Each structure stands twice: as C-alpha cells, then as structure tokens.
C-alpha cells in the first residue's frame, strides 16, 4: 500500500482545510454502522450496508485531482463523483434540485471491472475498450480522478494511466468526490488522498495532469467564483434586554439595516410578543406583523431610527419592554429607495445585487396579471408579499419558494400546508420581474399599497432550498437526520414543512451560541421562545444538520423548505475561517 495514503502526518490547518470524507453526509442504507478513521480519509462500509460517503468541499469551477485506494474487501465498489445536491436520503429532494435522488447524475467506476457507469443519459463518452484497458483487481492499485469543472469533464485513471474523458450532465450543479459499497453482501474499505501529506507530485502517488490541483480551501479560493463579500456587512442578529426607554440604542451591526425584524423572546401574546417588521422604505414607527394579517400600523413608541450600526427600538411593549429579552434579525438592501419601471407596474425599490436581497412597494390595480421589477438581476428564489392597506379577511402574507413552483402558495402568517394557487398567474419570476395577479385582494386590491421582500442565492452568503425529512430515531432519523450543505457557516435558518400543518421555525447562532440550537421562534404565531429536544439543529462550518426526529423539522418523508444566511463563508476572502461551535452536553 502507498505510504502517501497511510501517512500519519497531514497539512490540514485552520486557515487551509483539505478535502476529507464527510460523515455527516453519509448515506446509510441499512442498520450496520459505517465508520471513518485516519482523519476522515478512511471509510469502512460493512457487508449489509450499501452506503456512500461524499467528500467535503464541493467543486463548482477549477481543475481538481485526488486518488483512492482499496484496503481489502469485495471487488464491488464505486469511486467517482456525485452532484452537490447529494443527500443522505435515497429519495430526497435537496439543494433545490426537485425530483432528483442522491444517485442521479453520478459518474462512477465500478471497480470490479473498472467499467464506467452513469445515471445521466448521454453524459458518458463512449469507449468500448475502456473497461478492458483499465481492469482493476488489487488493493495496491491507485485509482485516479481528475475533475475539470471548467470544461465539465471527468477522467479516471489507474497507476498513472488515464482513460477517456467523460462529459458531466448538463445540470449546472457542482460536484464532489465519493466512495460507495457496490452491493449488499460485500464489505469494503477505502483510503483517500487529497494531497494533504505534501511532498512530490503535490502529495500524490502519481502526478496530477497539468493544471490540476489538490482540493483545499486556499486552492478553492483562487479557482472558484465565490462571493467577494463579508456576510456580516449584509446580515446580522442582535439581542438585548428591554428597558422601556425611547432613547435606547441597539448596536453591533456592521451596516445600516433596511429591514429589521424584532421578536420578544419572553412574551407569547399578540399584544406583547408579535413578530414586528420595520423597513426603510416605509420609515420608522411603521410596522407589519408576520404572525397577523393586519394592515400596516404606526406607533410613535415603535422603532425610532435606523442607524449606521443598528437601530433605536423605541419603548413599545413589543420592541423594548423593561424586563423582556428581544432578538432582531437585520438585512441590508440598497439604502435609499428608487423608482423601478422594469415591469408594467412601477415599484419603489431598494435592492442589493451583491447580497441578493431587495424589497419594494407598489400600488394595486384591481385586475389582471401584472409584472413588478425586483432589482436583483437574477431570479428570486423566495419572496413574500403583504397588503399594507388592508388587514381584513384573506389579506394574509403570501410566499413563493422556487422549489414548489409558480402554482404553489405558502402563507407566512399561517402554519397550514399551503397549496395550489393562480396567484402568480402560473408565471415563474424572471431575472428582472415578478408576476402577481392583481385580481386577488391580498396582491392587487385597487389603490392599496403592497410590500414585497425578495431573496435569491448568493454563494457564500445565502442558501435557499429544500430537503426531505428522515423522521423516527436511530439509523433513519434523529442523530442521523438530514445534513444540508450551504457552503458557509449559517447564522440564521428558517424552516417550514410543506404539505402538513407545521409552524415556520427560526433558529440562529446569537441566541444559541452552542450546538445543538435548542431555542426556536415562529413567524406565524406570537409565541415566546421555545426550547427542548424537538427542534435540535447543529449549525456547522459548511451547513446545518437536523438532530431531532420532531415533525417540525424532520418528519419522515416530510418536504421542508429552508432559507439560510451566513455567519462566515467558506472559503473566506477576508482571513476569516469558519469554526466549530461548542456542543451542549444535553444533546
């Protein structure tokens, strides 16, 4: 066996992380446990477990190389690449790729005969001699993978000799390496080398093809089109103890917020504990509540001022009552609002293409399918609409999530399942406009004023997607619940199960500085902060993992939508490295 696979010394450091296996993302199909060791560079998969391990650090651009070696076992094993929407559930939806299972669009080598396999029709370069030329039968052989994400091709080799190139599917997603047991009934072990031992051949047994690099965060930073932004300059979460003083200043943000969402952590009634949303388009003292269909209200003791590093919450019971504790989630858009005429209805808009957040107001026309400019420059993946003028029956908050499509509507102020609706006139948002049916009073009542909040994915800052719950406990759920890759360390996560009545749940890393987060709030009810084991989530350096079998986040086969915003991106261009969080001993 190769010394470079078996060395006890690796170059991994906090400022330059190297690729490894990701045990939080493994697919365990049966009861026997898989195992990792040697710094997550060795995988053991028992005979009755046809399981798969993906690696960390998914790849979206650049040229990458790594090596794999068997360490005994059956000849039925797979080495290869899998899409970044890979999930721990065989039939799951994840990362917003609707209808894809974890094995769709893989390109692998079945090492029993080294024959290429792909579940993506037409994606593999045909070469009838490939299997015979690359026969692979011994654990001393080194399998080589060269992945070119710029040309979207992958090439496999053995002991320094490469076969033909394979075309990646036209799915526009990123890819990552993975290993898998080929069939039940076979026990296999795998050793991986991502070059972290250093030395000749960039740390590998065989020299990578020209231009191909080892997988580590410094190389990723150079090669991949990551976001040139600092998350804390666009999103922040702050907490404070109320004092009923209008002059009270809440600071700690690195920006002047355009949207401030305040929630009492102690109070649980609409009079004292409502979700309060303030925005710079409408100005201080004006608010709407996400847990109520009421129209916009004004209160002279509500939020007094948006400041360069925070805000003044006022002395109102719902924002700064003495003896209560509060949290505010804050976003930066584009500052001063401007008129936008991209649609056939003018909007008053503030937008940040850099952070993927905009908000705008418009006036309802009373009829017809109308378009509204949103200012993001790319398709929104989530938006919510509220009538500011009318709070009577049916003027709920309407919400769109891209994975559910234009024919589906959710309600931010309700725990219900949502359902089919023509509210968007069956028209998906575009890079410039959102279509809304003004025949619905809650979307276009003639003369009424409406507000829309829009978000889209920004690599390294925000992630909007969908996952499927595993439910139960033991192997199929609980501690082995879904892992959702974000590409950053989340500061804030909102989750809603679709298809069942369950609350919209918000968790953040400011109220819960250690894992698992066990304090959650709701958007749809003015309840006090709840704690306990039913909503455990780990906020990790590259995503989040569901730790509880509870129905609100992990119902078996449940369909869950999520939004996540970053604390720190990975890799970071600003010398900030995502770090692990302390674990609470209660979980």
Please report, for each region that a protein language model flagged, where it lies by residue.
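Active-site region of the double-stranded beta-helix
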Residues: 79
